[in-house]
A protein has these predicted regions:
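A general structural signal for stabilizing positions within well-ordered secondary structure
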Residues: 35-36, 88
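Conserved C-terminal portion of the radical SAM core fold
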Residues: 72, 92-97, 117-219
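Core AdoMet radical
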Residues: 9-28, 39-54, 66-82, 90-121, ...
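N-terminal pre-core extensions flanking Radical SAM catalytic domains
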Residues: 1-25, 37-38, 192-219
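Short secondary-structure boundary/capping segments
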Residues: 61, 111-115, 149-151
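Helicase-associated low-complexity regulatory tails and linkers flanking the ATPase motor
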Residues: 25-35, 59-60
């Protein structure tokens, strides 16, 4: 993956792994896919890492199963997967799910180092494609205050939207009271309903900012 989202970890993101460990091992298990009876595959669901930044995923998209009817993939919208146009032209139903975890500066912090301007530009390219486009928000302490802006954005741009509440890392859960969630108590039933975790949250963010080389003033 080419992103080091604060809601992710090194087991999913090679970007985070490379920041935390210079000898971070990258395991290529793509043979497990190619050894499947691909002629029996009619639907393919591609999850992260980031498909647009993976050579393995690109190879899969260029050599899809012969009887494939539908394809869904998620993306952080840092890049455009241009192969999708050709896939649609083959009569395959394509759904693109874009991770939308904030607007503007909130996006840039939560989904570091992906920049909002690039994200938005690529999102509009996907919107112009002949694909089914939807957006997904993982609601955490870092973006709960921006959730209303996210809803406004998807409505203005006529985008399908779904969301779920983050469970891990637990320190970023909206269930705790802290400087981010307290102002949003009542927005959802579970927001800021449990103990104050400001101390743990600050320690977590300081460590994560340091790993990414982010000035804490941007938080």
């Amino acid at each position: 993956c080419n992103s080091a989202c604060f809601t992710c970890d090194a087991s999913y993101s090679t970007k985070i792994g490379s920041l935390t460990n210079k000898i971070y091992p990258v395991v290529d298990n793509s043979n497990a896919y190619w050894n499947l009876p691909l002629e029996r595959v009619v639907h393919l669901d591609i999850n992260g890492g980031e498909p647009s930044a993976s050579k393995n995923y690109k190879r899969i998209l260029q050599n899809l199963p012969p009887n494939l009817k539908s394809l869904r993939l998620n993306t952080n919208c840092s890049l455009v997967i241009e192969e999708l146009e050709d896939i649609v032209a083959k009569g395959i139903d394509v759904t693109v799910t874009v991770s939308l975890d904030g607007i503007g500066d909130v996006h840039d912090y939560v989904r570091w180092p992906i920049k909002w301007d690039k994200f938005y530009s690529n999102l509009m390219i996907y919107k112009s494609m002949n694909v089914k486009l939807n957006t997904w928000t993982t609601v955490s302490a870092l973006n709960i205050r921006d959730f209303k802006n996210i809803i406004k954005f998807v409505k203005q741009n006529k985008l399908e939207h779904s969301y779920a509440f983050l469970e891990k890392p637990d320190v970023l859960s909206v269930k705790y009271r802290n400087k981010f969630t307290s102002a949003c108590a009542g927005q959802f039933d579970l927001v800021a309903t449990q103990r104050n975790n400001n101390f743990e949250l600050e320690a977590f963010l300081e460590e994560q900012d340091k790993v990414r080389g982010i000035d804490e003033a941007l938080r």
